[in-house]
Amino acid sequence: MTSKLNLDPKVIDSARTSAAHIAQSMQEFIDKHTTVSTERTILRLLGIDGVDDVERPLPNVIVDAVKDAGGLPRGVAYWIGNAILRTGKKPQEIAEAIGRGELDLMKLEQGSAEAAAKAIEPYVNKALEHIRRQTEKRNEYLTTIGEGRRPYLYVIVATGNIYEDVIQAQAAARQGADIIAVIRTTAQSLLDYVPYGPTTEGFGGTYATQENFRIMRKALDEVGEEIGRYIRLCNYSSGLCMPEIAAMGALERLDVMLNDALYGILFRDINMQRTLVDQYFSRIINGFAGIIINTGEDNYLTTADAVEEAHTVLASQFINEQFALRAGLPEEQMGLGH
């Protein structure tokens, strides 16, 4: 069979092989390292949420305390598991006690890693089961009420006020939109924490928070049932809190995520090593939750000539594909370029 584009399969295979070498060399680094955002994500998946009395997210409070005491290389899951054994409290109760200054994880008697892992196992399983149920709910909607014709119509809302976004999103769905993307407020990708609760003020977009995800998901389910068509929800899993937003999206049944470390490196000056570690964990989560990812090559073409710099886009797409495969993301969930 002749390709419609008359592309040379040997050149494509060669490019994939080169990209695989690049991704694998980085993967060896990724497998040996963690980041503060990856550790905060683990806390969120253990059910820890909320803020302390000065509005600091509890995952940040815990990870910062563990990091300052030199305990982060052991992994925050160990410290929470050990605290469960020593105090008899649940992860959320432990987090709240830390937030009030009543508990220091590092001063507790330290047990074995195996015992700590066993202590957190019920909470891990609870999170996984919740995400599985959300995936099943999506599939149930697609089976019962169906979806729009392809290609999907993609509409952006970005008022800064999640409640105004809901009105616009439902109106767009009634007019034929298949995917609603809620653009994040300007520079949220450079915040090293995820804001808490519903938000009504933003700049050029709306804050990505778990409560905002929940509000919009509920609204799109309602309008989807009304018009007889499942409406997908898209947000942005990139920047300094990439895996945290992926976890929040998995818990609240988002369907599509912009998910790319490379444009964060090129356009946001984000630490290369950190963001590639974060990307790996975020893509594991997206893969498990059935979330489609789109990468960020379109950003390159906002600053350069599309023809002259086409090779940079192709290189990024090949590398992104290989990183996604190493995270276990099915090809059906890979969207290259946005």
Q: Model regions: which residues?
A:
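Long, compositionally biased, glycine/small-hydrophobic-enriched stretches that function as flexible linkers
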Residues: 1-163, 171-176, 187-215, 237-257, ...
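Active-site/pore-lining binding-face segments in mid-to-C-terminal subdomains
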Residues: 182-184
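A glycine-rich, acidic short-motif signal
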Residues: 218-235
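Flexible, glycine/charged-enriched surface loops at secondary-structure junctions
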Residues: 226-230, 327-334
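Ligand/cofactor-recognition surfaces for anionic moieties
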Residues: 321
